Design a protein with these regions (language model features):
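Structural beta-sheet core signal
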Residues: 77, 116, 182-184
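Carbohydrate-binding surface patches
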Residues: 169-204
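Substrate-binding clefts and catalytic carboxylate motifs of secreted carbohydrate-active enzymes
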Residues: 87-92, 97-100, 104-125, 163, ...
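Noncatalytic carbohydrate-binding groove/subsite architecture in carbohydrate-active enzymes
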Residues: 1-112
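Alpha-helix capping/termination and helix-coil
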Residues: 64, 68, 111, 157-164, ...
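A Trp-anchored, charged/polar loop motif used as the substrate-binding/catalytic surface
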Residues: 54-55, 163-169
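Glycine-rich beta-alpha junction loops
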Residues: 30-32, 81-82, 118-123, 188
Length: 204
């Protein structure tokens, strides 16, 4: 899961080298919380620093590329989310949506693909949900209710074109028709602070 790349990933590739094997690709997971505090049925984790989390993905890339025969092998993040627990109210919040927006803006830098865990809150390992919002993994709550993070993905889906701006708070692209589209986020907890952004965009 990317927890101990230096041991498991490097050892795996050393084994492949010794046995004359070549993997088609490398897979890993990506979750971005500290161990949660439990309160009854729920877990309340603290979000990890996003840059620190992204650095772990780059570490996987660097380990793979340190082997000449495996350099450039695609890495697929087969699960990612903030929390790995299906009873985390964070999943149902605007904060989750904003944090995931930042992750989406960067996950493609060193990964071939990345798959959000998961689409719906009906999670087979936990059975049928007992309420529409119970902290499940999904983008969509029980009864087909889109959660805030669903809209993050919907907005990013519309970002097709050439990226002309990317920062810690926003991404802007210019489409073939010359129009600009962007997504901005503000992962502030509680009352939070207002966010003011200024963009300098090319017109040519």
């Amino acid at each position: 899961c990317g927890v101990d790349d230096k041991r498991w990933l490097r050892c795996f590739l050393e084994f492949c080298r010794a046995e004359g094997l070549r993997p088609d690709h490398i897979t890993r997971h990506h979750y971005t919380i500290e161990p949660p505090e439990r309160d009854g049925h729920y877990g309340y984790p603290k979000l990890s620093d996003p840059e620190t989390c992204l650095a772990t993905l780059q570490a996987s890339r660097d380990i793979v590329d340190s082997f000449a025969e495996f350099r450039g092998l695609p890495i697929h993040v087969t699960e990612f989310n903030t929390s790995y627990s299906p009873t985390t109210p964070l999943h149902d919040t605007n904060l989750n949506a904003a944090y995931i927006a930042h992750q989406l803006s960067r996950l493609g830098d060193c990964n071939e693909s990345y798959s959000y865990w998961t689409f719906g809150d009906v999670f087979e390992e936990s059975g049928v949900p007992f309420t529409p919002f119970y902290g499940g993994f999904g983008l969509v709550a029980d009864h087909c209710i889109p959660k805030p993070t669903f809209w993050t993905f919907a907005f990013f889906k519309k970002l097709q074109g050439t990226c002309v701006h990317r920062s810690q708070q926003a991404v802007v692209v210019r489409g073939a028709d010359g129009r600009y589209r962007g997504v901005a986020w503000n992962p502030a907890e509680g009352g939070g602070e207002a966010l003011s952004l200024t963009f300098a965009l090319p017109f040519a």
